Regions:
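C-terminal end-helix/capping segment
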Residues: 76, 159-187
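A short linear-motif detector with a strong N-terminal bias
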Residues: 61, 80-81, 134, 175-179
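N-terminal polyanion-binding entry modules of DNA glycosylases/AP lyases
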Residues: 1-122, 126, 184-210
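Catalytic DNA-binding helix-loop module of base-excision-repair DNA glycosylases/AP lyases
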Residues: 51, 123-169, 195
Length: 210
């Protein structure tokens, strides 16, 4: 068992039982596997996040692929997105609102208001603040970016529906916890809340059938 898993188990008996039931989850391997499904650069990852909002994984992948096709198979540079024909972007599958969002992302990058190269040097809170300044990018998206792109070790998205469901089941709560309650329950998991999040998501995949 990894040092992080041992610390989680020691900090919380419910998490200890979950770890024993599910076995070892290697944080780096799992995050790397997930990252391989997304663009490698920060700009592409955020662009892909906007495209995929409120869509199934399959639909998001299809639409993102169509957008890449508009730009010869490559992630469009911010300048290209701003100059792109809206009709073409809509035909690829973007809604009018998402066209506005991807262009706002491009504008922030070009204006230097979102300095992607320095995100690695910022705290988690500062990264979230930078990202949510872009229209269409909310706190949840910023938290997933922290976890799966920047691979930060202590990310817990209290508002994530899957995590809330898992916490309700594992902690035997009568009602689904509020985001604030999830963060309260997860306080003992610091500084390994990213690993705890993976265990909670994994618990849903391994839940017994009704």
């Amino acid at each position: 068992m990894s040092s992080a898993a041992r610390q989680l188990a020691a900090a919380d008996p419910t998490m200890a039982a979950l770890i024993e039931r599910l076995g070892e989850i290697d944080l780096e391997t799992r995050l790397r596997r997930r990252s391989e499904e997304r663009p490698a650069d920060a700009y592409g990852a955020l662009l892909r996040a906007i495209v995929g909002q409120q869509l199934s994984t399959k639909a998001a992948r299809t639409i993102y692929g169509r957008i890449l096709d508009l730009f010869e198979g490559s992630t469009p540079a911010p300048e290209q997105l701003l100059e792109a024909d809206e009709i073409g972007l809509r035909a690829a599958g973007l809604s009018g609102r998402k066209v506005e969002y991807v262009r706002d992302l491009a504008s922030h990058v070009l204006a230097g208001e979102l300095e992607l190269d320095r995100l690695d040097d910022l705290s988690d809170e500062e990264v979230v603040e930078e990202i949510v300044a872009v229209r269409g990018l909310g706190v949840w998206t910023a938290e997933m970016f922290l976890l799966f792109h920047l691979e930060r070790p202590d990310v817990l998205s209290g508002g994530d529906l899957g995590i809330r469901k898992a916490v309700q089941v594992e902690y035997e709560l009568d009602e689904m916890p509020t985001p604030a309650r999830v963060l309260e329950i997860g306080e003992p998991w610091r500084p390994h809340r990213s690993l705890a999040s993976l265990y909670l998501w994994e618990s849903l995949a391994n839940a017994p059938a009704d």
